[in-house]
Amino acid sequence: MSGISKLSDFWVEKYKKESKKSWDKFYKRNETRFFKDRHWLDREFDCYFGLPDKLPLTILEVGCGVGNLVYPLLEVQPNLKIYCCDFSPRAIDFVKKHSCYNENRVFPFVNDITEDSLLEVLGSACIDTLTAIFVLSAIPREKQLRSIKNLASVIKPGGHLVFRDYCDGDFAQEKFMTSGDPSMIDEQTFVRQDGTLSLFFREEDIAEWMKSAGFGLVTLDRVNRTVDNRKRNLNMKRTFLQGVWKKL
């Protein structure tokens, strides 16, 4: 724990309260340039998105950002109907401005999953597969269970939630812990310089929250990657959690 400066209660509450504003500023500053398109999702989770000759599936992506997952997925799965939400209005605007936007296939909307009912928007449990890719880590620990229950409310019985996010022990967490800057909310949650939150999950925590929300575990694994940063002469050992749960 040496080298870590914990934030005061005042700043912890301020960063949590202004999280939505911080993400909207992030998209104002970076527009569509920051995140790469996620072309790996259909490879990692292909059986949860169906094949082109199967019946259409209804997908919900939470924390969709500017559409880096939505549009690559539509390219390879033409029968999908995708709802997507983000709590940044600016991000949703970028989704709608995308050159491949089709209002008959893509249905973007603003939603804060920690507070806003998804069921009120969708009207029923109509989702076959829900994706939560690097989104729950932006939510404080105390709001995790409520948020996951919100996700569960719109998934069909037998439908699936697919998940990938930051894991305890990741290089980025170690960087936070040795930076010397006052950025720590707790041992697993930190504040980036732009004011956004980053929670590093432990397997037992996410497994318990999912179970309490009415999901049965299909698979949960650590994914280890080594990323070379040649400019900074760094070998970064990235560690993510990747899992699938079934709505009971």
UniProtKB/Swiss-Prot annotation:
Pfam families: Methyltransf_12 (PF08242). This is tRNA N(3)-methylcytidine methyltransferase trm141. S-adenosyl-L-methionine binds at residues 23, 27, 63, 86, 112, 133. Its EC number is 2.1.1.-. GO terms for cellular component: cytosol; nucleus. GO terms for biological process: tRNA C3-cytosine methylation. It catalyses: cytidine(32) in tRNA(Ser) + S-adenosyl-L-methionine = N(3)-methylcytidine(32) in tRNA(Ser) + S-adenosyl-L-homocysteine + H(+). Disruption phenotype: Cells lacking trm141 show abolished N(3)-methylcytidine modification in tRNA(Ser). Cells lacking trm140 and trm141 show abolished N(3)-methylcytidine modification in tRNAs (tRNA(Ser) and tRNA(Thr)). It is found in: Cytoplasm; Nucleus. One of its GO terms (molecular function) is tRNA (cytidine-3-)-methyltransferase activity. It comes from Schizosaccharomyces pombe (strain 972 / ATCC 24843). The lineage of its organism: Eukaryota, Fungi, Dikarya, Ascomycota, Taphrinomycotina. The gene is trm141. Belongs to the methyltransferase superfamily. METL family.
